[in-house]
């Protein structure tokens, strides 16, 4: 059966010497794995069309199991996401988070909207690292956990100015008054906790201007990755490149 669906490539894996297996998140919010024959050969024209983040109309044959890609009518190549290693690595983290949050057969229209929103924001100049934080905040529940950043997990104190870190012992933010009860709490700036709470609750269609200092973005990114590792046992493949880039900076 010949299928035509709009979608975005969220995963691309080399298969053999000349083929690729790509996964698209289609416009209905479903993951569709496709075999792209000879996609690594320049002459086929599929090499550029099967890169990560390509948004287009995918035409493929589907019977049982994995479909076979015929062609792609590219709507957006998202070149900016591929020209800078930092941008590409954090955009990959966002895509990987969404891809791994879904089991086979899941249909999640919101995930498609979220991915489109994030890629468009990055294209327009918003920090890719910040947008990866947004995705990870929005996908937490799909990995089986949540996190509270707006009140002390020990006392219930919801005075934002009193919050000074995140406690894995008590599973939530911790205030300065209770800090002695967890000497291993991760110390965070008050602004980081506040913005994590805002971004977690704010609908994506209300996120207009996102201008946040890099130090705050770094803190948010670090604690979010720690939360995923601690509560969901997740280590993302994209992190490997991110960690390598950070080491080169030191």
Swiss-Prot record:
It holds the Pfam family RecO_N. One of its GO terms (cellular component) is bacterial nucleoid. It comes from the Bacteria. GO terms for biological process: DNA recombination; double-strand break repair. InterPro entries: ARFGAP/RecO, DNA_rep/recomb_RecO_N, NA-bd_OB-fold, RecO, RecO_C. The keyword Disulfide bond does not apply. Keywords: DNA damage, DNA recombination, DNA repair. The keyword DNA damage applies. Involved in DNA repair and RecF pathway recombination. Belongs to the RecO family. This is DNA repair protein RecO. The gene is recO.
């Amino acid at each position: 059966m010949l299928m035509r669906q709009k979608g975005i490539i969220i995963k691309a894996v080399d298969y053999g010497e000349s083929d690729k297996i790509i996964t698209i998140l289609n416009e209905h919010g479903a993951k569709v794995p496709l075999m792209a024959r000879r996609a690594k050969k320049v002459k086929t024209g599929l090499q550029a069309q099967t890169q990560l983040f390509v948004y287009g109309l995918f035409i493929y044959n589907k019977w049982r199991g994995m479909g076979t890609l015929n062609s792609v009518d590219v709507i957006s190549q998202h070149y900016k996401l591929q020209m800078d290693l930092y941008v590409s690595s954090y955009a990959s983290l966002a895509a990987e988070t969404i891809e791994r949050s879904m089991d086979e057969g899941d249909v999640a229209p919101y995930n498609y909207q979220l991915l489109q929103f994030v890629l468009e924001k990055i294209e327009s100049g918003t920090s890719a690292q910040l947008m990866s934080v947004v995705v990870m905040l929005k996908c937490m529940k799909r990995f089986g956990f949540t996190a509270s950043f707006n009140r002390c997990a020990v006392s219930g104190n919801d005075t934002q100015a009193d919050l000074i870190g995140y406690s894995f012992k008590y599973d939530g933010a911790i205030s300065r008054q209770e800090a002695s009860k967890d000497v291993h709490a991760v110390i965070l700036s008050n602004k980081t906790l506040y913005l994590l709470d805002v971004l977690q609750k704010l609908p994506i269609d209300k996120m207009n201007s996102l201008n946040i200092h890099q130090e705050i973005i770094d803190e948010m990114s670090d604690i979010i990755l720690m939360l995923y590792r601690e509560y969901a046992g997740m280590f993302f493949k994209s992190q490997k490149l991110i960690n390598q880039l950070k080491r080169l900076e030191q």
